[in-house]
Amino acid sequence: MYSTTDFRRGLRIEIDGTPFEIVDFQHFKPGKGGAIVRTKMRNLLTGRIMDNNFRSGEKVGRPDMENRDMQFLYREDANLVFMDMTTYEQIYMPEETTEGKAGFLKEGQTIRVLLFNGTPLAIELPAALVLEVTETEPGAKGDTVSNVTKPATLETGIVIQVPIFVNQGDKVKVNTDTREYMGRE
C-alpha cells in the first residue's frame, strides 16, 4: 500500500483493480478542512488521463506489476509478438500501446516488457540504440555548412534527421526518447 505522502511522478498505483501512473500531483490545503492531494493520472490499460483528489494520508494499492526481459519476434497485423525468455511463452501486444516505440524494434532484440497480471502494458527501450542506415541521399561534396541535415531511413523503418556526411550502410546511434541522431558508430 502507498500513502499519499509517497506520491511522486511516475509512481504506479492501483485503484479498484486498475493500474494508474501518476503524471502530476499537488498537495493542496484549503482554508477549511483537511489537506488533499490533487493528481493527474494515466490509466495504464486505456492510456486516458484523469484527475483525482485524495485526502492527505489516504492509502492506495500497489499494482501487481513486473518487468520481464522478452525477445521481440515479429509483427502480426497490428500486434507485436514477444517471447518470454524463461518460459518460451509468446505474448501479443497491440502496437498502439507502445506510444510510438515500436518503430525501434528489430526482430530478435531483447527488451523489457511491463506486465500487469500477465497482460503487457508497455515496453522499455534502452536510452540509445545503434541502427543501420538503409536509405539516404548522398551528401554533396564540399557542403560544409554547419547543421545541415537530411532524412535517413533506418533498418527498422523509422526516419530521422542525420548530418550530411552520414551515408547508406553507416551505423548511427539514436536517442529512443527524442528520435534524434547522437553519433556514428
Curated annotation (Swiss-Prot):
Gene Ontology BP terms: peptide biosynthetic process
Record's keyword terms, sorted: Cytoplasm, Elongation factor, Protein biosynthesis
Keyword Cell cycle among UniProt keywords: no
Gene Ontology molecular function terms on file: translation elongation factor activity
Pathway: Protein biosynthesis; polypeptide chain elongation
Cellular compartments per GO CC: cytoplasm
Any Pfam family: Elong-fact-P_C
Subcellular locations according to the entry: Cytoplasm
PROSITE patterns linked: EFP
Record-stated family: Belongs to the elongation factor P family.
Role description: Involved in peptide bond synthesis. Stimulates efficient translation and peptide-bond synthesis on native or reconstituted 70S ribosomes in vitro. Probably functions indirectly by altering the affinity of the ribosome for aminoacyl-tRNA, thus increasing their reactivity as acceptors for peptidyl transferase.
Protein name (database record): Elongation factor P
